[in-house]
A protein has these predicted regions:
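Active-site-adjacent pocket-lining segments in enzyme domains
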Residues: 1-35, 39-125
Length: 125
């Protein structure tokens, strides 16, 4: 199992919904990984999950929400993995897919993982 939360400007309409924070807290306490894309990392901060954890999103998103992210450690990297949490910029979706696959033990071997990565990058046509 894994929770994947896409980002986008629409998150601001539901960011303060308590049911989302409660669900994410239950996932973490049940050892269910959570992956977010860009601004969706804000859901993790609202649930107090990113406190003192490394995360990433677009710099513009971070700067617009600096106070929301003040207890987290912003890196600006393409992708961050911190225990059960994966955060990624929208420019790192192939890398995110690989990290999710590794976390869920979906690849039989390195060759399969490399082939999947190439496919995600549009290199296997």
């Amino acid at each position: 199992d894994l929770i994947l939360i896409p980002g986008g400007d629409g998150i601001r309409h539901v960011l303060h919904e308590k049911v989302i924070s409660e669900t994410l807290k239950k996932c973490i306490s049940s050892n269910i990984p959570i992956a977010t894309v860009c601004g969706a990392a804000a859901f993790l901060t609202k649930a107090n999950i990113l406190k003192e954890r490394r995360f990433t999103c677009l710099l513009e998103t971070y700067e617009k929400n600096r106070t929301l992210f003040e207890k987290a450690i912003y890196t600006g990297n393409q992708l961050e993995k911190d225990e059960l949490i994966i955060t990624a910029k929208p420019t790192a979706l192939a890398e995110l897919a690989i990290e999710i696959g590794k976390m869920l033990h979906l690849f039989k071997n390195e060759k399969q993982m490399d082939s999947f990565y190439s496919f995600c990058k549009g290199e296997n046509e």
